């Protein structure tokens, strides 16, 4: 992970359409939902979907297993 003091710049921004060029989701396209410049990672819509176990709460009274996107490294995407 990059240090907090160093400024980093990503080649993609939020709402850019990107193509995944490496990894399990290679070839998929999606919109960048969120970018983390310090960690050089981005969250792409419909890519790197994992299951997340959540505790019981008002929105999920019995708890649940939800699927959501997790970040991937910015070097694995290109603008498309």
Swiss-Prot record:
Intrachain S-S bonds: none
UniProt xrefs under SUPFAM superfamilies: Translation proteins SH3-like domain (SSF50104)
Keyword RNA-binding on entry: yes
One Pfam family per UniProt: ribosomal_L24
Cellular component terms (Gene Ontology): ribonucleoprotein complex; ribosome
Gene Ontology molecular function terms on file: rRNA binding; structural constituent of ribosome
GO annotation, biological process: translation
Domain of life: Bacteria
The entry's keywords: Ribonucleoprotein, Ribosomal protein, RNA-binding, rRNA-binding
Signal sequence segment: none
Claim: Ribonucleoprotein is one of the keywords in the record: yes
PROSITE patterns cross-referenced by the UniProt entry: RIBOSOMAL_L24 (PS01108)
InterPro entries named among the record's database cross-references: KOW (IPR005824), Rib_uL2_dom2 (IPR014722), Ribosomal_uL24 (IPR003256), Ribosomal_uL24_CS (IPR005825), Ribosomal_uL24_KOW (IPR041988), Translation_prot_SH3-like_sf (IPR008991)
Function as written in the Swiss-Prot or TrEMBL entry: One of two assembly initiator proteins, it binds directly to the 5'-end of the 23S rRNA, where it nucleates assembly of the 50S subunit.
Self-association and partners: Part of the 50S ribosomal subunit.
Family statement drawn from the similarity comment of this UniProt entry: Belongs to the universal ribosomal protein uL24 family.
The protein, known as: Large ribosomal subunit protein uL24
């Amino acid at each position: 992970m990059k240090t907090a003091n160093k400024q980093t710049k990503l080649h993609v921004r939020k709402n850019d359409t990107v193509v995944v060029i490496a990894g399990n989701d290679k070839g998929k396209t999606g919109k960048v939902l969120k970018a983390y410049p310090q960690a050089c990672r981005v969250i792409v819509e419909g890519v790197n979907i994992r299951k997340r176990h959540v505790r019981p709460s008002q929105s999920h009274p019995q708890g649940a297993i939800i699927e959501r996107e997790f970040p991937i490294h910015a070097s694995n995407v290109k603008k498309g």
